[in-house]
Amino acid sequence: MPRFSHLIGCVWQVLFVSAGAQAMASSFVVPSTAQMAGQLGIEATGSGVCAGPAEQANALAGDVACAEQWLGDKPVSWSPTPDGIWLMNAEGTGITHLNRQKEGEYTGRTPSGADVTLQRTN
């Protein structure tokens, strides 16, 4: 009988952990590129603003050379994540991850340590 009780206890633990993992996974929804696309401005603290659209095809347009000065690499694409946006170079390597602060606003650090803010302007 003690083995059966132990088995039942283990089964309950597995069920609770599985249910918790499912609930947690469903709370981290990755926004679609269509939801995040639009006119954006990126600013490095005290260095001005670079503007350009983030297109639905995950491409960046506009003055990316301006942002390249701060990021140390030319951002050509972006990818949404559950908690923000990755800016990536031509090889698809992540340059920096920007964390979502509120609707339409993301902050992060450049590889050199400068603070950057990305904001929706439309």
From Swiss-Prot:
Gene3D superfamilies recorded: 2.40.128.10
Any GO MF annotation of the entry: metalloendopeptidase inhibitor activity
Region of interest (Disordered), ranges: 101-122
Presence of keyword Kinase: no
Subcellular location: Periplasm
A GO term from the CC aspect: periplasmic space
Primary site of residence: periplasm
Superkingdom assignment: Bacteria
Family: Belongs to the protease inhibitor I38 family.
Name recorded for this polypeptide: Alkaline proteinase inhibitor
Annotated source species: Pseudomonas tolaasii
Organism lineage string: Bacteria, Pseudomonadati, Pseudomonadota, Gammaproteobacteria, Pseudomonadales
Protein's gene: inh
